Every structure is written in C-alpha cells, then in structure tokens.
From Swiss-Prot:
Protein name (Swiss-Prot/TrEMBL): Orotate phosphoribosyltransferase
Obligatory cofactor(s): Mg(2+)
Organism from which the protein derives: Campylobacter jejuni subsp. jejuni serotype O:2 (strain ATCC 700819 / NCTC 11168)
GO MF annotation list: magnesium ion binding; orotate phosphoribosyltransferase activity
EC number: 2.4.2.10
Family: Belongs to the purine/pyrimidine phosphoribosyltransferase family. PyrE subfamily.
Keyword Glycosyltransferase: yes
Chain sites annotated for binding orotate: 117, 145
Subunit relationships: Homodimer.
Length: 202
C-alpha cells in the first residue's frame, strides 16, 4: 500500500508553512480528513491497520482517540476490530473524557490517531484512560511523521518522541518531514507566516 500516493491523490499532502498541533513548524502537512472523507477508502485503510495489529496478537477491549483528528480513524479501526470506541476531547486546553463515556477497571485500550507526530495528544488520552483504571496496551495511527518508533515498520525512535518506549505503535506508513521550533524555522526567517490547520486550529 502506497500511503504517500493515497494522500497525494486525495489532496491531503499539503505544502506551505504550517504550525502543527505539537507547536512545531513544518513545510508539509498531512490533512487526513481529506483521506477519511471517503468511507470506502477509510474502511480499506483501517481494515489494513486492524490486520497489522491482529498479527501481533495484542489483546484489547476498546479503542480511544483524541478529538478531533483521531475520531474518524479510531472509529473505523474499532469497526474493523469489532471493538468499542470512545474519544477524549480538549476542554479549556485540557484533555478530558465526557459524553457519558466510561472506562472499566482493567479495560485494555489501544489509543488511535490519524497522524502521530510526537505523540503528545495520544499520550494525553492514554493518561486519561489510565487515571480511570484502564490499561493502555498500544498505539495506532494511519501514519507516523517519523519521530516515534513504529513496531511493524521497525523504525527508530527520535528525541522528540513522547510515546512510551515500552508500548508498541502500529501505522500504515512513515512520512519523514523536517519539523522546526519557531526560533530556528527557515520558513519563519523568510518572513512566511505559519498557518494553523488540524486538531488545535481551524
């Protein structure tokens, strides 16, 4: 499966100057909503991701995603795995569990995102689940931006990664884009203003 080509064909592989949800800057942005707006394609991708997870024989009960970007990917993955789905959401800048969702003590979760950059939002969701008595057994995403180690791709962990080293991350592919702090961003130095798409922007 050529994930990069799928993103390009869907108009989801964007070039410009972007402020990522992690606070970093990048010349490229992956707009997964453009991929997931096609239900058949969303199902195909998450069916494939479910097969990868199943091949590692990890036992889990439910899937949780951080809103907003992770909801479609998480729901489709839950469908493919025949598991329960819940989501966390940000209220006053803090991740929380609302809408009557509950976590049973000992319930095992995979945290699912559309894209994992440093893994900050996924880690926030994991901490919520664990604070309520759940157990996080792994992470999943359509794509990894190259910072977190991916179990099925055998890709290494980089310094910016926030996901726990002892839990696996499963994805369909890696996109290795350079990301920058605002202070050393070459696009900022050229006078270009970063726009804020995605989970914490428009």
């Amino acid at each position: 499966m050529n994930l990069e080509q799928i993103y390009k064909d869907c108009g989801a592989y964007l070039e410009g100057h972007f402020l990522l949800s992690s606070g970093k800057h990048s010349q490229f942005y992956l707009q997964s909503a453009k991929v997931l707006e096609d239900p058949k394609l969303a199902a195909k991708l998450c069916d494939e991701l479910a097969k990868i997870i199943a091949s590692y024989k990890i036992e889990f009960d439910s899937i949780c995603s951080p809103a907003l970007g992770g909801i479609l990917a998480g729901y489709e993955l839950a469908r493919a795995c025949s598991k329960r789905f819940i989501f966390t959401e940000r209220v006053n800048k803090e991740m929380t569990l609302r809408r009557g969702f509950e976590v049973k003590k000992g319930e095992k979760f995979i945290i699912c995102e559309d894209i994992i950059t440093t893994g900050g939002s996924a880690l926030e969701s994991a901490k919520i689940i664990e604070s309520l008595g759940g157990i996080v057994v792994g992470f999943a995403a359509l794509a990894n931006r190259g910072f977190c180690a991916v179990e099925n791709l055998k890709s290494p962990r980089k310094d910016n990664a926030k996901l726990p080293e002892n839990l696996p991350l499963f994805t369909l592919g890696n996109f290795e884009f350079e990301i920058y702090d605002e202070t050393n961003c070459p696009l900022c130095k050229k006078g270009n203003k970063a726009i804020k798409p995605g989970s914490r922007g428009n």
